[in-house]
Amino acid sequence: MRLYNFNLAPSLTLGCGSWGGNSISENVGPKHLINKKTVAKRAENMLWHKLPKSIYFRRGCLPIALEDLADRKRCLIVTDRYLFENGYVDDTVRILKKQGLEVEVFHEVAADPTLAVVRKCLSMANAFKPDVILALGGGSPMDAAKIMWVMYEHPEVQFEDLAMRFMDIRKRIYKFPKMGIKAMMVAVPTTSGTGSEVTPFAVVTDEVTGVKYPIADYELTPNIAIVDANLVMNMPKSLTAIGGIDAVTHALEAYVSVMANEYSDAQALQALKLLKENLPSSFLNGANDPKAREQVHNASCIAGIAFANAFLGVCHSMAHKLGAEFHLAHGLANALLISNVIRYNAADIPTKQTAFSQYDRPKGVERYAQIAKHLGLEATSDHEYVEKLVEWVDGLKSVLGIPVSIQAAGVDEADFLAKVDKLAEDAFDDQCTGANPRFPLISELKELLLHSYYGHAYHEVYEPEPQEIGESEAA
């Protein structure tokens, strides 16, 4: 049996203060009213809101923003082969050289960067000795650049230590080394979605063991983010769709996180509003609607700031494992899960209450309803607002051409069913799980994965209450 008292005020009669006793140990009299009980309240931790020192935005801001590097000597640009071979790096190199900087380019980053690639980039850095590292590209070049930055500044680090999980990023067992002694980090996104240019996160894969190391610490936050929408005007439609829904997921999870606060809320809501108004046109019209492209690019960054401080939830926990196991793009994996995650989190009676000092009761329904109202959706109750929010997300995915299920995305059924138990276990142990508004059971994560595989709407399944011996006979 589950008993919740989230909305009950303390009773004046059920027990007294320091004298002990309870309401049935003796008749309650006037003396008990004098002995006031002390009601324990949760103490809230100090919160924070961290972001890069400088964020430049608006189309064409790149040359002006790079003037911040005028006092630097050597810049190592980290990018991928496609951007390098198609001229996306040329303008940046030209601007930096005009300012008197020596420039070298590492362009061998691929999707899901590996330690081998990062070490190759590190060899170039150690020989060149840059005082600026500039990541140019999507999430993969930024991840590679951030990890290389750590290894360049602190060759003694062990990734097992850096990847150690924590409940509070400020109170981790392993203290992250101080960054920025040798070089500063500049991030220039050429895709709209990851928000990595403003976040303290990076992921690298050990190609030998297959282990993914998710690294999280505010020391990894870039010093400068340059959000120039001119760099995303010609993004292909598939990348626009996957990146856009990734940004939507970032904002949704940040808003309902147990660590959400007044500062991150505003950014999550604004990001969702911009995405609702502009993502469909950005996808359908591309460079023919430059304003929509720019607003989606800004929304991606704003959502990044929100989840950099409020963190994410079980949608990302499962997407990390699903994408890695079946080679699905991260944004696509999120898209295949987010609708059912909303349904799962919108529960007034969770199986297990999440543990965080400022999160004193389930707020999933209330918070999702607030999002729906902010987006202008219409309903008559909070639960109906949640349904309307899911309908909007599903409608957006349909416009973007995203498959309706994991199965429709091409994942083999037998292979998925053979691995779903391990996926659920690994997702439970993911760093993102702790900030989810509903603390999950592994069995619940498995059900979410199964429902999402077949494209079924998640619904709560309650186990029957255990019967007392003889109860069934009496019935």
Give the positions of each predicted feature:
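Short, amphipathic C-terminal "tail helix"
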Residues: 415-475
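C-terminal segments
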Residues: 1-49
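Gly/Pro-rich interdomain helix-loop hinge
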Residues: 328-415, 458-470, 475
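Short glycine/serine/threonine-rich phosphate/pyrophosphate-binding segments
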Residues: 62, 85-88, 115, 140-145, ...
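Carboxylate- and glycine-rich phosphate/diphosphate-binding segment that chelates Mg2+/Mn2+
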Residues: 198-310
